[in-house]
Amino acid sequence: MAFRINHIHLKAPDPRKTAEWYVGAFNFKIVGDETRVFGDRFIRCMSEDGALAVNISGARKNETLGPGDAAAHHGLEHFGFDSENLEVDIARLEKLGARLLEGPIQNPNGPRIAFLKAPDDVRVELVERKKAISGGCC
């Protein structure tokens, strides 16, 4: 069996508010909203293309959550989104409350990237790939 990523799970003090931010920022769809047996509010989201599930929940009963960390760090450090225009998307996300942390950065022979702080101290990356030149090479 080939492994594939099943979902990403974010923890948030206000799961609905966080889910609605991702709806506005990246066209996620909210496909479920419930209080689980664990006592946490649990919001199920899907990416616009339906390829990635993102779950957003609060603390479970008797669970104390530490702070988020949008700085570079060990462990799961960020998740990335494709961008057709970094500057346009950075400005749009900043209007939604995100904060630019790094970039835009041009990787030699690679994409342009930028890192932003999203709600709940989640680090997200925007990736703008080089555009193909029409008519072929040279």
Residue ranges, per PLM feature:
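Short amphipathic alpha-helices within nucleic acid-binding modules
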Residues: 21, 87-92
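N-terminal beta-strand motif that seeds the catalytic metal site of vicinal oxygen chelate
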Residues: 1-19, 76-81, 127-138
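Exposed loop/turn and edge beta-strand positions of beta-sandwich/beta-sheet ligand-binding modules
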Residues: 4, 39, 75, 110
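A short, acidic/glycine-rich surface segment
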Residues: 39-41, 61-67, 102, 133-136
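Core segments of cupin and vicinal oxygen chelate
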Residues: 2, 9-54, 95
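A short acidic-to-branched-hydrophobic micro-motif
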Residues: 53-56, 126
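Short, charged/polar surface micro-motifs in flexible loops or helix N-caps
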Residues: 49-53, 60-62, 86
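Vicinal oxygen chelate
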Residues: 81, 90-138
